[in-house]
Amino acid sequence: MQLLILTTTKMKFTRKANANWKGTGMEGTGTISTQSTTLNNAQLSFKTRFADGVGTNPEELVAAAHSGCFTMQLSFLLNEGGFTADDLSTEATVTFEDGTITLIHLDLKGKVPSISAEEFEKTAAKAKEICPISKLLNTTITLTATLVS
């Protein structure tokens, strides 16, 4: 059975999130909640976005979505190639500059028995290209893939 589930299976679903904001951009505060309630009134403010305030921000949420989507897509591709990862860990770093997300860097570390470094890097590059969140984003996306023994 082919397992490119995230890109080839004819699926349609929706997910929802809500944002609420009160006040001005600088002084106001808001919350973000997700349908799954994983985020349930998570705090959002100028300080959480542009300084070190307690809470979350859109760029952090993009990084979380991208790292999760990419890592899951990679797992499907590895499985399709006959490999099962012992561990895949991806850190997404979102760069915000002059009002725009200018770069997202994916730093992948993976432990996958019996795969060559070349095959691992090739599969990771394919996952980066076909991950639905990668396709959604209109920015430069770079990748460092490290196979750990």
Where are these regions (language model features)?
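Extended beta-strand/beta-hairpin segments
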Residues: 2-64, 71-149
